[in-house]
Regions:
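The feature captures the conserved acid-bearing segment of alpha/beta-hydrolase catalytic domains
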Residues: 215-290
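Gly/Ser-rich "nucleophile elbow"/oxyanion-hole loop immediately N-terminal to the catalytic nucleophile
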Residues: 100-106, 155-190, 200-206
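Active-site machinery of serine-nucleophile hydrolases
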Residues: 108-173
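Acidic beta-to-alpha connecting loop that harbors the catalytic carboxylate
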Residues: 117, 150, 243-246, 274-275, ...
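Primarily recognizes the serine-hydrolase "nucleophile elbow" in alpha/beta-hydrolase
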Residues: 181-231
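Alpha/beta-hydrolase-fold serine-hydrolase catalytic core, especially in secreted/extracellular enzymes
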Residues: 27-48, 262-267, 273-438
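A domain-start/cap signature at the N-terminus of enzymes
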Residues: 27-108, 409-424, 438
């Protein structure tokens, strides 16, 4: 090797080492920034940390990998934890129960329980009549249990409780390692009504919904918003009502349940012949309910879904679709509003329709998304690398017309925006495609 060749060789090695060193330093810096993001003590601090990450111009795939792994959870308190419920009309505390053998390196299912008799006037009803905090068996649970507290000023069928339960779930996500695809909602009596309400308002987090001795029909009189049967089509529900129920007469509940069974292939219903308005039947069905839970993890990215709302600000999103703007177009009427039940041989309106709503019906095949709309002027498709092939063009067809076609470029800012909202390692988004309906 000549001296010139030798110098060239060592120069090449030097440049290679500098490049590798810079790559390693960039990776270390990104890991530090993401760690700062996870350790932020408030939403504002986390937003600031997210902006720092964006300014660092990281490689998208590296940031995506770090967010999909998530934070390193510290050792936390186990047992019974009181969590404040914010809000003017809410009872002061909810209860969260953490398994006694909780290990922060394992992810745990979550079960949210909505108690009955929510029209009571006691802000401490949860402690006095529903939850025995001295019951040691509760600590042997293999799931993280969340017990929100409701009363007459904040029943389950109002926005204040929908927001409260979202914040409680966010608190648990922030402090404990959960399996985001195994977050289950259960309610008894009034809590069963609440299950129907919450699933209809925001279904994104739930894997399974189990209303026991509740009433979907009652929401026609109780709900502070419109209820849409279409929103249950993709739900995994295990419903139990009783034949001798003296509060929710099965004769009037059955037509609504029959409608759910006809539109949702993932809904199961058990009618207990011998019971009144009680849970005496539960031991006999416990194993069946648990099997149902185990068989129905949440799918963050279903290839077919439907969503309907009259309020795009509070309830416009379902998983990877979001209704942005409502309005009527003469040809914008291709999707159907499921809103009839057969009552005593006659078809009647299931739920009132006093406010205009919008509906999206979405089906996806490979990278082609077909959308039918009713009463929608604009919507958004959220694109995840776990759902779409970002190396190939994405095509969106709205009401039979092409709305978008092209390569979707992953964006760090969008990734962080939706992670800030969801804090969900199993549902990350790389891009938004906004579509105006013509």
């Amino acid at each position: 090797m000549t001296s010139r060749q030798s110098r060239a060789f060592f120069l090449t090695i030097f440049i290679f080492c500098v490049i590798v060193s810079n790559i390693s330093l960039a990776q270390i810096r990104l890991e530090q920034l993401v760690q700062k993001y996870w350790l932020a003590s408030s939403t504002i601090e986390r937003q600031k940390a997210a902006k720092e990450i964006v300014r660092a111009s990281p490689v998208f795939s590296e940031l995506y990998q770090l967010l999909s792994v998530g934070k390193r959870y510290p050792v936390q308190s186990t047992g019974i934890v009181k969590v404040p419920q914010g809000g003017k009309y809410l009872p002061p505390h909810a209860v969260v129960i953490i398994p006694a053998d909780y290990q922060p390196d394992l992810s745990y299912p979550v079960q949210v329980y909505l108690h009955g008799a929510v029209t009571n006037n006691d802000p401490f009803f949860l402690y006095r009549y529903t939850l025995d905090t001295l019951d040691a068996s509760l600590l042997q649970t293999k799931s993280i249990l969340i017990f929100p507290s409701g009363w007459s000023l904040a029943p389950w069928w109002c926005h204040a409780q929908a927001d409260n339960i979202h914040r409680l779930l966010s608190w648990v996500k922030e402090n404990y390692n959960i399996n985001e695809n195994q977050v289950r909602l259960r309610g008894v009596s009034d809590g069963g009504i609440g299950c129907y309400y919450l699933a209809n308002a925001d279904q994104t987090p739930w894997s399974v919904i189990t209303p026991f001795i509740g009433s979907l029909r009652a929401l026609n009189q109780l709900s502070d918003r419109q209820i849409y049967l279409s929103n249950f089509i993709n739900s995994s529900m295990f419903i139990v009502n009783t034949n001798q129920d003296e509060i929710f007469d099965i004769t009037w509940e059955q037509p609504y349940i029959n409608k759910l069974l006809s539109i949702s292939s993932k809904t199961s219903f058990v009618q207990v012949d011998s019971s009144r308005h009680s849970l005496l039947w539960y031991p006999a069905l416990k194993d069946s309910i648990e099997r149902f839970n185990q068989l129905h993890d949440r799918n963050p990215f279903p290839d077919a879904l439907i969503w309907q709302t009259e309020d795009v600000v509070k309830y416009g999103r379902y998983k990877y679709i979001r209704i942005d703007k409502l309005g009527s177009l003469s040809k914008n009427n291709n999707a159907n509003d499921e809103n009839q039940v057969q009552m005593l041989g006659t078809f009647v309106q299931a739920f009132s329709r006093e406010t205009p709503s919008g509906l999206l019906k979405v089906t996806k095949s490979n990278n082609v998304v077909t959308v039918e709309t009713q009463g929608v002027l604009q919507y958004t498709i959220l694109v995840s690398p776990d759902h779409f092939d970002l190396t190939s063009p994405v095509k969106i067809i709205t009401n039979g017309k092409k709305s978008f076609e092209g390569i979707v470029h992953p964006d760090v800012e969008t990734l962080l925006k939706w992670n800030l909202k969801d804090n969900d390692r199993k549902m990350l988004f790389a891009a938004e495609i906004k579509v105006k309906v013509n």
